[in-house]
Amino acid sequence: MVGQQKLFQIGDFNFKLYHILVIGLLILAFSTTFLIRSQPAQYGFELMEFDPFFNFRATEYIVENGLSEYFEWNDDKSWYPHGRNVSSNSQVMLHITAAISYEIFGGNSSLYDFTILFPAVIGSLTVIVIFALVRVLGGTTAGIIASLLFAVALPVLIRGSIGWFKSEPLGLFYGLLGLYLFLSGIRTKDKKFTILKIVSGGIILSFGMASWGGNQFFILPVGLFILVLPLVRKDHKFLAWSIPLFVTIFLLSSASFERPGPQIIFGLSGIALLVPTVFLFVNIFIQKISKEKNKIKNGKIFLIIVVIIGIFMLLMMSSYFSETTSFRYLNAINPLLTTLDPLTDSVSEHQTTSTSESFIFNSILMIFAGLGVWIIFTKNVFQSKIILRNDMRVFALIIGISGVYVSSAFLRLELFTSISLVILSAIGLSILTKEIFKIKVSKKKNYSLKISYVLLISILFIIPLVYPENNWISTLDYAPTVFSGGTSYVLSTNDWLVTLDWIKNNTPEDSIIGSWWDYGYWIQTLADRTTLIDNATLNGNMIEKFAAMFLSTPDDAF
């Protein structure tokens, strides 16, 4: 084949023509997603939304004062008069990574401008990580397709545009990279590389946890994957040391951060990994003492028993988990809890995803993912021509199903649906494409079939990018939030920037400002003034008092 033509050699590696094609397509995916993510910059080079302003201020503190001071920092501009212990309740690795990146790559740019650009760059680099991850699951073609689909996946774009200096872009980068290293590690035959990848995967996945709490989602598919590993792989001696190594490194590394902290080990996340690891050993032992013909059967019976007991124990220990686990994460497991916490329910990004929103967000990915699920389940159809490892096949199904499930709780988590559908779609399309191009009929029909297939897939891929009017690309054509005052109106003014600048230059430096919590971070960062409440929502009682005050008459309010 032309693609296998050798171009040059670097050490023992033969650089072939198809490597150029892969690199070119990855550059295309990176460039495409970066341009789409950069659309808000045409209205003004500002941070998006609200939380990024606090994250900028925290990163600035590290750059100006160092890491040791950061971990001792009690932010006295927040939640007056108590302040806020920043390292204990914020995304530490986001601040550290951005600060280190600025020192290395910042050059002569201001830190503010650097943090505006940071999420778009990190989000765009994630197309390479998703390529590597899906390549491990389904091959190079699947990886390329995944990178192209991920580049335009709407929920991922929305929460990773230029100026979106929040936790999701970096959290996804670390989370998917850690997942890739883990899966690649348990596939690698060289023991030295296996240990290196597994240890690195555990540490980097913990970085993801310290960057974004939503990365706890990745624990669910990993835990379920560990449960079924002894049933789909026969190298039990390898599993007996590699899996505990990964779980131990991940939990210890995560526990070393103040958030999530040591409580992760015996919280819901830790148990979701520790119990499957114990099960792994027991299942291996059961299979070892079973007769050859009954090994898998007995292992499956034990798995069913453990799942039933696990569900029962979850119900029995619900009060324990409610004390050790954030309500938002419990809500992701049980979407029916949404309305029990009014403060959580009042936040727009915590609203339940509607059916219409799901179709807008994922549209064609649903069809491609359905194809992927069908192909994975009907493995015998393609078994003779395409090899898809059983363990990787199972993981693709697990992450696909679990991603769709947890996203049903919050609109914010819809990006996990996109990631799941991208993985399933890429695997399905890659296998189907290979099968189509292997069909040999008459020369004329052969060309017609292949051209028709390419046109059909291309049209289906392009439709959500251009139709309807509010499509996957145009959805990001909006001004940074500070230009619209946080409203949903399509406008761009400097009113808020002028107001905050006026506060900064015309009020005493020791002023204490009371506003609705949405605007706390803006006032602290752009006006350089202390606030009573802010977007961290650390004290629900204070927020309730402000709500009552704003909804009361002037006499009652005071």
Locate predicted features.
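Loop-to-helix entry region of an early transmembrane alpha helix in multi-pass inner-membrane enzymes
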Residues: 80, 84-96, 105-128, 161-165, ...
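Start-transfer (signal-anchor) and selected internal transmembrane alpha helices
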Residues: 1-39, 50, 144, 280-310, ...
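Membrane-interface helix-loop-helix junctions at transmembrane boundaries of multi-pass membrane enzymes
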Residues: 192, 235-241, 292-303, 367-398
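Hydrophobic/aromatic-rich transmembrane helices and adjacent perimembrane loops
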Residues: 397, 402, 406-441
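Transmembrane signal-anchor helices characteristic of membrane glycosylation enzymes that use polyprenol
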Residues: 13-52, 57-58, 64-70, 74, ...
